[in-house]
């Protein structure tokens, strides 16, 4: 992998920025590297919360920043790798997040359970007509209302993507659509070939899965398959379609970053030479 090659050659540590790899025991469906595959390179922000809990980007940002300071203190280089657009941006751009209130959140969760998330969605749009969110995105709707009630302000986040913290070097890995489609299809096939269904079965025996874990791409489909709601073929197809949508969303997100280095990964060996050149110049290594 390109990140492992870079960390190996530049005395680096990997700091995970994939929100789903934060969860313990969710390995196959998140494409988490095994310990042996990590080649002895230190990895951070992996397996840090149970699937029964809910990840928080605000908590993640603070933890990741602490990791980065620790890595710098070791005279090593942190490689933030991922992943989830908001999680990456939270660190790279030092985003500030509104406060939380567990009491308000609980009231909203209970109301959504009783009356349906559509009621809360309608209320949110009445309060802030310009806010855009899918009617079925329960977590984001509840968080938006929580922010609106606590602060009295619009829940729309302001993402200062022109301002970068900590002198990050941003390398955006791209490839043509045909190559991407093939890679995504192979990725999804590997999930099921490597035992995603069994992994989900064990997760259900060990944990009461939280909303995020239960709705994760691949895991949601495996849960539906185990419940007899869909066939294995339909589970695979749905996983692939959601994976493609997520990839397209990530492409659009990272395209907005200013001052980024774009590297075509169609040929991985060529791509790594470009990455090495970028890092050599940035670190002034001859």
From Swiss-Prot:
The lineage of its organism: Bacteria, Bacillati, Actinomycetota, Actinomycetes, Micrococcales. Keywords: ATP-binding, Magnesium, Nucleotide-binding, Transferase, tRNA processing. Its cofactor is Mg(2+). InterPro entries: Dimethylallyltransferase (IPR039657), IPT (IPR018022), P-loop_NTPase (IPR027417). Gene3D superfamilies: 1.10.20.140, P-loop containing nucleotide triphosphate hydrolases (3.40.50.300). Residues 18-21 are annotated as: Interaction with substrate tRNA. It is an enzyme of class 2 (transferase). It comes from Tropheryma whipplei (strain TW08/27) (Whipple's bacillus). This is tRNA dimethylallyltransferase. Its EC number is 2.5.1.75. The record marks 84, 105 as: Interaction with substrate tRNA. It catalyses: adenosine(37) in tRNA + dimethylallyl diphosphate = N(6)-dimethylallyladenosine(37) in tRNA + diphosphate. Monomer. Belongs to the IPP transferase family. GO terms for molecular function: ATP binding; tRNA dimethylallyltransferase activity. It comes from the Bacteria. GO terms for biological process: tRNA modification. The gene is miaA. Catalyzes the transfer of a dimethylallyl group onto the adenine at position 37 in tRNAs that read codons beginning with uridine, leading to the formation of N6-(dimethylallyl)adenosine (i(6)A).
């Amino acid at each position: 992998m390109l990140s492992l090659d870079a960390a190996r050659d530049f005395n680096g540590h990997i700091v995970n920025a994939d929100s789903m790899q934060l969860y313990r025991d969710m390995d196959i469906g998140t494409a988490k590297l095994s310990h042996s595959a990590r080649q002895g390179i230190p990895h951070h922000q992996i397996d840090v919360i149970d699937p029964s809990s809910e990840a928080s980007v605000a908590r993640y940002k603070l933890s990741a920043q602490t990791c980065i300071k620790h890595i710098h203190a070791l005279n090593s280089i942190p490689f933030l790798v991922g992943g989830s657009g908001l999680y990456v941006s939270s660190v790279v751009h030092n985003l500030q997040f509104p406060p939380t209130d567990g009491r308000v959140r609980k009231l909203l969760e209970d109301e959504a359970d009783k009356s349906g998330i559509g009621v809360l969605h309608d209320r949110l749009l009445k309060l802030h007509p310009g806010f855009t969110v899918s009617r079925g995105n329960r977590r984001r709707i509840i968080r938006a209302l929580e922010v609106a009630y606590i602060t009295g302000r619009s829940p729309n986040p302001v993402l200062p993507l022109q301002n970068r913290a900590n002198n990050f070097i941003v390398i955006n890995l791209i490839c043509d659509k045909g190559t991407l489609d093939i890679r995504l299809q192979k990725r999804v096939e590997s999930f099921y070939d490597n035992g995603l269904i069994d992994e989900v079965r064990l997760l259900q025996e060990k944990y009461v899965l939280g909303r995020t874990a239960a709705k994760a791409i691949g895991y949601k489909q495996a849960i539906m398959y185990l419940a007899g709601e869909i066939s294995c073929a339909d589970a695979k197809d749905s996983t692939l379609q959601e994976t493609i949508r997520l990839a397209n969303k990530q492409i659009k997100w990272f395209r907005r970053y200013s001052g980024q280095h774009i590297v075509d990964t169609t040929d991985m060996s060529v791509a790594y030479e470009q990455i090495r050149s970028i890092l050599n110049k940035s670190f002034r290594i001859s």
